[in-house]
Amino acid sequence: TGHIIAAANAVIAPAADRMKASHDIAIDRKRSKGPPGGEMAALDPVAHGRVQVLDCPSGDVAQAMAAVDELVRLSRLDPEWSWSRAAIIARDWRRLTPARAYAESLGIPVEMANESMPSIWRLREMQQFIDALRRDTTRLLAIRDLVDVLNAIPSNRWTDLIAEGIAALAKELANKTMPVPDLVEWFAEWANDARSDQRSLLLLTAHRSKGVEFDDVVILNGGWDRPSKGEDPDAPRRLFYVAMTRARRSLAIIADGQHPFVQQGAEHVLRRAAPAIGADVALPTALYQVPDLKTVDLSWAGRLRTGHPSIASISAAKVGDPVHIVREGPTWMIQDAQGQALGRMAKSWSPPERLSFLRGEVGAIVRWRKSDNQEEYRVHLHRDVWEAIIPELVFG
């Protein structure tokens, strides 16, 4: 919007080493006929599309809560709101942890840009879906057939994700049919591409934000006033400018007193106090570890001999089932509610220091094969194909 561009240009103007020589960025011609506040000029009765500077008490937790609360406020103004078009940007990852915990506590879907999603193709649900398609490779299937196949699989967040894939294919296929081998290939490509799609409120650093845009952005305070080692004095200002220009529709900036870059008094900026946090609000301290293949010994179940009780327990396990982690020698085991081992964490994994294990659940179940392992390790494997449990863990 005009207001976001005016604020960003004012921030970058003092920088000695201009990113684009003497050319200020300008608004898209298609948008230039609209109000400088864009659609938020009419939608937001508080800021009217101006860039907000929210004055907030110091501390990572207070500002994280102010940032999330501001996005919640905006979400209530827009019936078309999607958390997948919103982001909170910080100078470093550490400041984003409380924002993650607070968003989770409010039930807001949230993801950190430095976390990787499990391989969609390897998910139990995806493999069941593909196995069902492959039962007869001579068929021509329509979208309704794919929906029927998916509906036969117990539903969870991963079947919801596959449903997104079917919806994407429906745009291409419409009322036509497609041969099974082509469908399998299409879903393999989609699974690879879909891993990088944003589906939730995204938390990321300014460095990571380069090249992506969001409708609504809040920038956290902290770390902007000093260059990192080896950086020139203008580097933080240029990085802050990058963060500001990620916002297409609305931009809020958290400050504690005078902001190092955003000056007061400009017509495109509204400075106001962030709403006070009530005394009854539980401050977020939880640390979330999302399902990540790198944290688990993926071949543990492949080393089990036929008849081992863990094999049946893994088959019976469902996404969302409670798990806990138990130390066993130098490693940590994943156990179900009955105390049966479901898997083992990677040797390189350990719980975060000074935090207690609060709860855990089966986050994902992936199919792994003997052929996925290097030749020298295959001698220890007693099965050709197995499932590995990938937990989601919460510490606090």
Q: Which residues fall in each region the model found?
A:
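Conserved coupling/interface region of RecA-like P-loop/ASCE motor cores
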Residues: T1-P36
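Core RecA-like ATPase module of SF1/SF2 helicases and allied nucleic-acid translocases
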Residues: V72, R76-D234, A247-L251, R271-A282
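Accessory/regulatory regions of helicases
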Residues: V51, P227-S299
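Short, conserved phosphate/pyrophosphate- and ester-handling motifs at nucleotide-, phospho-/glycolipid
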Residues: T1, G211, A346
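Well-ordered alpha-helical segments embedded in enzymatic catalytic cores
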Residues: Q63-R73, L239
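Alpha-helical scaffold elements adjacent to nucleotide-binding pockets in ATP/GTP-utilizing enzyme cores
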Residues: H3-V11, A66, E70, P98-S105, ...
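Glycine-rich phosphate-binding "P-loop"
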Residues: P36-A66
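Conserved active-site motif detector
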Residues: G265-G396
